[in-house]
Each structure stands twice: as C-alpha cells, then as structure tokens.
Amino acid sequence: MNFSLTINSFFFLATLGLPLSLAAQRAPAASRATVSGTAVDGGAKAEPLPFATVLLRHAEAGDTSLVASGQTALDGTFALPQVLAGAYRLRVLAMGYQSLAQAVRVAPGQPSVALGLLKLRSASQQLGEVTVTGQKAVVQQELGKTVINVEKDLSSVGGTAVNVLENVPAVAVDATGTVSLRGSSNLTILIDGKPAGTSNGGPGPRLDQIPASQIAQVEVMTNPSAKYDASGAGVINIITKKDKKEGWNGQAALVVGNGAKYSPSLSLSRHVGKATWNLGYDGRDQLYRTRSNSQQTALLTDGATTSSLYTTQDGTGTQHNRNHSLNLGLNYDLTKEQSLSLSVQPHWEHQSELDNQTLTQQTVGSPTVTTQYGQQIADVKVTVLESSADYRHTWEAHKGRELTANAGMVKIDANIPVSQLLTGGTAPAGFKQQQQVNAQIYFGQVDYTLPSADGKGKLEVGLKNQVLRNTGRTAMLKPTSTDPSAEFQLDPTNSFAYNFTQVMPAAYATYQRTLAHGWSAQGGLRSEGTFINGGVASGTASVNRQYVSLFPSATVARELGKESGQSRLQFSYARRLNRPDFMQQLPIQLYQDPRNYRQGNAGLLPEFSHNLEVGHQLNLANGASITNTVFARFTQNAIQRIRTIDSVATRENNVGVVTRETYANVGTTNSFGLETTWAQPLAKWWRVSATGSVYYAQIAANALNTANRAALAGTARLANNFTPRKGLDVQLTGSIRSTVLTAQGRQLATGGLDLALRQRLFSERAALTLRVSDLLNTQVRRTEIATPELQTALYNKFETRVAWLGFTWYIGATKAKPDRIDAAPSSGGGFGG
C-alpha cells in the first residue's frame, strides 16, 4: 500500500468538517445566552450532584419541544449555551431525587442567565410508618453508557481498577486479570481518555496497579461513537480523582490483610492560585496462596498407530506481589480559557511465583506410571514510566466550543526469568527461560468541538496517532541430562530475538443534533489505519501488514412519557475491529515451557463486527430506575485460538503431552443478549441495586473441521447498601456467573459473597474499614476441555477469602463523605481461579 496516499486520505477525512466549522463560526451569536447553574443536594450540606440530567424546553403554548440538554459535572455545575431569547422551562433530574422544574426567561441581548444553586429534594414514598428515601446510586445507567461511582461502592474500595471492573455490569474479569465485555476480551481501556491496560494487551499501566481509591468513576460504552477507537467490543474509560480545593488536601491510608498483605497509600494535592500540584504514592506487598489440579487424556498418532496418554498434575504455590507507584502532576490555568496539565507516573512491579508440582504420566492400558516432582519459579520485574501533557482551550463567548490536545509516551521494561526443576523419571530435569521485553508507546491526539449557531447541534472532529515500538529476546535453556544437578545449555532452536513497529493513525468526524418532539440523533465516521512491520532478528520469519478501514456509527434517541426524563428509548449502531497483534501473526514456535508452545499465523486477517443496541431507560418518582438493553453482534473473520496435540514433539521430547496453539479466522459468529439494571431505595436505611445479563453466544470451534457451538450464558449481581446508624455504612454483595462455552469446552459456573463495613470517625476526618472478600470461599476456576484428541479437567483456586482492616485519614478540606469508603483492598485473581 502507498503510505503517502494513505496519509493523504486521512488528511482529507479530517478536513471534511472544516467548511462546516468555518460556516458555523461566521453565524452571529450575540443574541444568544448561556443558561448556567449548579445542582446540589437539598440537605444542609448542599453537596453537588454530579451526572444529573438537565433539560431546557420551550414554555410557550403549543410548543414544549426540547431546546437544549446536558449533564452536570463532578462539581454539579452545568451550562447550556446558545439559547435564544424567550420563555423556557428547565428541569433537572438526578437518580434518587425528585425532579426540579423552574421557569427561565432569556431577554433579548442578555448574554447569560445564572440560576445559582438548584436544590433537589430526596425522592421519598410513604409505606405505612416507613419513609423510603432515595440515595445517589452507585451505578448510574445512561443509554449507551454506564457510569459507576467508585467512591460509593464498598465492594471494591481500596482495591485496584481490576476489582472495580469486576462490579461493572456486562464486564467480567478472569483469574489472570484479563477484562472482557459481553464475553469479548478485545476492548479499548482508557485512563482519563489515554491508552491503558497492558493486562489486556494494550499500552499503559497494568490495571491491577491502579488503586481504586484514586478512581472517581468508570464509564463503560458498549457501542461508542466514532470519536473513540474502533478496536474492541467497547470502551472502558477510568476517570481518576481531581481536587482543586484551596491549600493542602488528600488522604493517607494503610490497609492490612490476613496472611501478610499490606497496602499503604498517600494522595496529596495543593491548589494555589492558577496551579494545582498533585503527589501520590501507592504500594502493595501481598502474599497469596494457590492450589491447582489437572487431569488430561491425549490421543497420539504416529502414522497408522494411535495411543492414549493420561497425565495428572497437582500443585500448591505462592504468589508474592510487591509494587510501588508514584504520581506527579501539575495543572496550570494559563488564562480563564486555557489550561495545561503535565504528569509523570513511574511504576515498579515485582512478582515472584513459586509452584510445587507432582506430575504423573501413564500410557492408557499400561500398568507403568511415571511420577515426577517439580518446582517452577518465576521472578518477574517490570518498570513502567508514563508521561503526558494536556492542553485545553475553551471560549467564554462561545460556550461549548473547545479545543483539546494530548501527547505522551509510555516506556516499559520487563525481565521475566522462569525455571522448572524436575526430579524422578526419565524425562529431562526441567528447563530455564529468560525473556526480556522493551517497549515504547508514543501517542498524540487533537480534538475540536464546535456547537451550531442555534445551540441544538454539535460538530466534533479529531486526529490521533499511536506508534508502538517493541523489541524482545527469549532464551531457552535445557539440561544436559536427567540429573537434577546437570548444567543447562542454550537451546538455539527455541531461542530468538525480535523487533517490530506498529503505527495506527486515525481521524474522525461526528455530528449530533437535538430535533423536535423529543428526538435526537448522532452520526459519525472514523478512519483507522494499521501499519505493522517486524520480524525475527535472524530473518527466518517476518510480519508486514497494512490496511485502512472505515467505521461508521449512528445513534437515534427519543424521550417518552409525560414527564421529561422519565423514559427514554435509544437505538445505536457501530462497526468495530479486532486487530491481530504482532505475536499472533509471527510464524515461529514460542515455547512457554517444554509442554506448550504458540505459533503465529502470518495469514491472520483482522476481525470486523457489526454491533446493534436497542435500550430503554425508565426513572420513577420514588427514586427507582430500570434500564433494559437488547444487543446483537455479528462478527466476520472471527479470530479463534486453535489448540492441537503435537504428536511428534510429544514422543521425541519425553516431557508428556506437547500442545500447539495458533490462531485462525474461522468464519462468522453471532451473539445476542439482554442486560437489565434495577436500583431502588427500600427504606431510609436500605438501598438495593441489581444487574443481570443473559446472552446467546455462538462460539467459533477451535478446530477447522468442527462446527461452531452456541449456548446461553449469564451473570447476575445484587448489592445491598445499609446505613443502620449515622456514620456507619454496610454493604453486602453477591455475584454469580453461569457456565460459559469456550472454544474447546466450557468454564464452569462460579460466584461469591462480599461483606464490607465502614465507620466514619472524628467528625468525618477519618474512617475505619473492614472487608471480607469471598466470605464463603466459593470463588474457584474450573475448566473442561473436550476435543477429539484432548480431554482435560482443570481446577485452579486462588486465595480469595481475605479479611482486610484499613484506616484512612483525610487531609485538609477532604472529608469522608456518606456512602464513600476508600480503604479495603480486594484480593486478586478475578473469580479466584
């Protein structure tokens, strides 16, 4: 592909909106006003209400159409720009509160209308002698977006971003920390809009290194607009806390868990004049225990001869995580309309794993059983350095107009030595492997937003580029004999060095508009390119792939019901992409250990999907809310892992069954599902929220000659929040995930129950927390694999039942707010498998 032509096509797409932008800027705005205000709790403290919906309608006879709408910021403020002179009716809606209505009049020539504080009363309903009082929800559902207020969710407080995502509707986290959305682990994860999530294969910090105490909210977009990256089943944006109170503010915390688990943290900010300085530290020194068991029967072929080999493996071990993270940042207001932010975030990770194993091997029909005893040791050290700069320009005279720019880099250095020593039997006495990875990610993005002259529309355009450079080296060493004291020597056949560069430019344009009779619409188009080039240093294998794709998106919504904001129906569509990574395409044998190796597929194509959603949201006067979403995903060139038995290597290596794993496009798969969220106050001291999903998933088979399979699967979560007395918060949370199909078999059902308490102390200057994760110790990972040549049963148990005790001290103007707990880490390992 001609690279210069590709760049020109991106430039052409990015400038499609330029004539519209210039025309909009010429339109006069002097006769229009900005309507602004602040939504607050009607109580004595008048706390701000973030994420409240603000609607402005005509108040003239025969015309009650919607003029403008918006959402309050974290501090409760809102601004509706470009409002013509006239009479209007403003309505503010927040979950758990009675809606507020107020008349608004804009006089000709008036530049602004400041409404001041708009106090919303808690929704209440009399049930006999019990008063039901609404509270702000932990999970706030918006059609197309789910917002999770982490500060008020006790089940993940003090843990990490992984623990937070475990509680998000439609999101699942497995034992390795991999995040999946509606069954797909291919998704885009952002932190404050920047790349993140190395645990899911993306650039940026590991999600298990981001403390939950530093997260304000999480946004989940299952069908995002063209403004966002097209890669993955959706977008998860983790928004961190930002404090601009005058002077010193922050918090210090120490959390201790049974079995040698410690988590200290410190977060400080200082706002002086135009500058806000931020300093943060988070540490983890935690020891976990593990158990595992596997039983496997493999069918081996050697010409016309076949035989079956039965193997077992029992293991017990430990995992020791020691991590340190710093966060240094500066936000400076250059002018009233311009700001600049700088941040540097170094991370140090050290993970030690020790696993003692007992292995048996027996040819089916033979009385001879070979037993070996092994010890596998891994000592992983990773250093991550992030740095970024952000620029923001707004126009006070033209509310809603905004220019933002972001640039930064992420540098990753990893050293991963793994060794296995075996005693007994006739097999070689283990192996040693040394892996080194060095990666640099450079990214930059520019976005421009321009409201239309009548204030009912908005144009957004943007450019983005991301460059990934990666070099790595793997050295495999084998023993010279079966003697446990034998020397190890380099195995050049399974040792190699590689390097690659991947460039991903993108451009987008979207336009949204509020229409008459409660209708609104948004449409957009995104273009993304992928240019990847690299290979093995010896020149024996390489990858060279270039392609450009277009990704349209559209959303149509309408407000229903007699009251504004009471009911809303929305339809959305988006085309999305699963981009194969370098190692999935590199056609070399990469051994993880003597029994397993991966081999890339040079002919692997990108996977494309068409995603559709229909959603309905209903907000009731008593503070209850119900959201239902029906979704469908149609995938072309579905990428699937294919695992087979390497009979030749199994017979020659004398280490048991040797499996080969590769990737292939296996055709088309379809998935359909329903998600439901319900939240309601049952009493003044009790609020309940429930989320559930059920979906019909078609799974691509892991063998090319095997038909696809399909089955129903589902998840459910029920959270009960209690306030038995002032200053004491209690949360009891239960979750379950049904059996789900995998390419080779199925993953059995699992679930758990968590209990958390927090007592605020010293006039809300401090808090004491207690949390017990997996109270019944039921979280376990069990997997079954069934193919014509391989039958496997796997059992993995991570230490999930942990009691955590934490103390938090709030510094400066920061205080422990009701329903907010900031210390009580969750144990790692997802469902505990």
Give the residues covered by each predicted segment:
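Short, acidic Ser/Thr/Gly-rich low-complexity loop/linker segments typical of extracellular
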Residues: 60-77
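Short acidic/polar hinge/loop motifs at secondary-structure boundaries
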Residues: 161, 167, 194-222
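Outer-membrane beta-barrel translocator/receptor signature
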Residues: 215, 229-236, 244-295, 320-324
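Outer membrane beta-barrel strand-and-loop segments of large Gram-negative receptors
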Residues: 441-445, 489-496, 599-601, 605, ...
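Short, acidic, small-residue-rich periplasmic hinge/interaction motif at the N-terminus
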Residues: 40-45, 53-59, 93-95, 112-155, ...
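Surface-exposed extracellular loop regions of Gram-negative outer-membrane beta-barrel proteins
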Residues: 234-235, 239-252, 291, 312, 413, 531, 562-611, 632-656, ...
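N-terminal periplasmic accessory domains that precede
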Residues: 117-118, 161-164, 203-205, 220, ...
